[in-house]
Curated annotation (Swiss-Prot):
It is an enzyme of class 2 (transferase). It comes from Methanococcus aeolicus (strain ATCC BAA-1280 / DSM 17508 / OCM 812 / Nankai-3). It holds the Pfam family CTP_transf_like. The gene is ribL. This is FAD synthase. GO terms for biological process: FAD biosynthetic process; FMN metabolic process.
Length: 156
């Protein structure tokens, strides 16, 4: 998927992107600022269920569609159900941006894995965005539960 134009810098980031919040947007803006083209890999529903123990609230195709509609994003694709490295190996990005809560990849291990496969990719880890009340999906869910459900079930 890498273009023949050696001057075009491709940036890739990945995530669940369930219940969009300003932290997601901040990560996407930052990722886009590092290159010319931003491609976002959306975690599959089944992958999220395996990792987090629950399916996302928003189905994968809707999450992909919403992310692709956000201004900094040039393209959004669904991840692989079988190999987390598959989209990276297809796209061959120059830079991979890992969000602050990225648990699928460790920056150093990912860089080493890709190097063994012949890809020299810069890995950047973003810091948590805390400039607003609802900077994570968990914060949004907590607020919904607080407003709409029995307040006793919320643990701080």
């Amino acid at each position: 998927m890498k273009t023949n134009d050696k001057t075009k810098k491709i940036v890739l980031t990945a995530g669940t992107f369930d219940l969009l919040h300003p932290g997601h947007h901040n990560t996407l803006k930052y990722a886009k600022s590092l290159g010319d083209e931003l491609i976002v890999v959306i975690a599959r529903d089944e992958t999220v269920k395996k990792i987090k123990g629950r399916k996302p609230v928003i189905p994968e195709n809707q999450r992909r569609e919403m992310i692709e509609a956000i201004k900094p994003v040039d393209k959004a694709i669904l991840g692989s159900l079988t190999d987390k490295l598959e989209p990276i190996l297809k796209i061959k990005p120059d830079i991979i941006v890992l969000g602050p809560d990225q648990i699928t990849f460790d920056a150093e291990n990912l860089k080493n894995e890709l190097k063994k496969l012949g890809l020299d990719v810069e890995i950047v880890k973003t810091k948590e965005y805390t400039n607003c009340d609802f900077h994570s999906s968990y914060d949004i869910i907590k607020e919904i539960v607080k407003r709409w459900c029995n307040k006793k079930i919320i643990k701080k």
